[in-house]
Amino acid sequence: MKFYETMFILKPTLVEVEIKARLDFFKEVIIKNGGEIETCLDMGMRNLAYEIKKNKRGYYFVIYFKAQPSLILELERNYRINEEILRFIVIKYESKKEQSAWQSLVNKANNKPEPKPTKAKKEDVAPEAKEQAQTEA
């Protein structure tokens, strides 16, 4: 199996349910044709560098997957016939260096930063300290 990354941009006029349906459809195409999805990034709504089909914004998605080369033709065919796709690209990672870079991208996408613990306010800590001081005395 080869390592791939695909990025596609959906029209900004779609509602959330339609966006999820399109994303699930493309994931299903990859899985049905023997691919293994490693991770999927929803990059959200972003401004386009230039106007595409009278749209200035679009929903960006990136999918990292492993598959046989024959899957790419089917995936690109589905991208082309879907009118909600503004642009798409499929990138193949061939060399060992590229494959290790692909793996680091997948790891970075899967390891989302955890929220930092909030510090307790002095007001919250003070009553507890007073109670402990009173019980010790």
From Swiss-Prot:
Return the Basic and acidic residues bias intervals. Answer: 111-137
Keywords from the named record: Ribonucleoprotein, Ribosomal protein, RNA-binding, rRNA-binding
Q: Keyword Cell cycle on this protein?
A: no
What biological process terms from GO does the record include? Answer: translation
Identify the Pfam families for this entry. Answer: Ribosomal_S6
The UniProt entry's GO CC annotations, sorted and at most eight, read:
cytosolic small ribosomal subunit
Q: Which residues are listed as membrane-spanning?
A: none
Question: What terms describe the molecular function in GO for this protein?
Answer: small ribosomal subunit rRNA binding; structural constituent of ribosome
Q: Which SUPFAM superfamilies match?
A: Ribosomal protein S6 (SSF54995)
Q: Where is this region: Disordered?
A: 104-137
Family, as annotated: Belongs to the bacterial ribosomal protein bS6 family.
**HAMAP family reported for this sequence:** Ribosomal_bS6 (MF_00360)
Q: What is this protein called?
A: Small ribosomal subunit protein bS6
> Which organism's genome codes for this protein?
Helicobacter hepaticus (strain ATCC 51449 / 3B1)
